[in-house]
Amino acid sequence: VQLRFKERAPARATLVDAMRMARAAGAAVVVNGDLALALDLEADGIHLTSGDLRRLSARPVPPDLWCGASCHDADELAHAVALGVDFAVLSPVCATASHLGAAPLGWERFKALIADLPLPVYALGGLGDADLPQALSCRAQGVAAIGAYWGR
């Protein structure tokens, strides 16, 4: 489970409750883009934004914590590999309402970008359950989504 807040994080008690529920269900919890918050909450890891990724010269957490990264191109994927992240999320594969105007990669480009990578990569961007077979056929670890799952 990824806790992601683009504006302002909810109250600490709300985050602690969310982590408790996720862990009770057997899920690990990573915090998106806020290393200090991830460490304060004793989360299971951090998910780096592409901006965070570009600014780093070393993995920001020890190997016992998850470290993921958002990537949008070959350079960001290469940097994620060099930092030793555990997984990447590559986007946008398709057009998405959450990032209007972003040029979609398409499945062929997605497949080419991840073909030789030594880490799992999730597909993101305008995707949902119906896209999982296509993602898997392109060697993705799976699909990640916001809108397709959040509104359920």
Language-model regions, residue ranges each:
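Conserved, mostly hydrophobic/aromatic
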Residues: 1, 38, 80, 88, ...
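A short beta-strand-loop structural module common to alpha/beta enzyme folds
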Residues: 1-8
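Glycine-rich phosphate-binding active-site loops on the catalytic face of alpha/beta enzymes
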Residues: 49-59, 87-101, 126-152
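Short loop/helix-cap segments at secondary-structure boundaries that form the rim of catalytic
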Residues: 37-44, 56-63, 78-83
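Conserved beta-strand positions in the central sheet of alpha/beta enzyme cores
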Residues: 2, 30, 47, 68, ...
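Alpha-helix-loop-beta-strand connector modules within alpha/beta enzyme cores
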Residues: 12-33, 50-53, 57-73, 103-128
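Histidine/lysine/aspartate-rich catalytic loop segments that bind and position anionic ligands
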Residues: 67-97
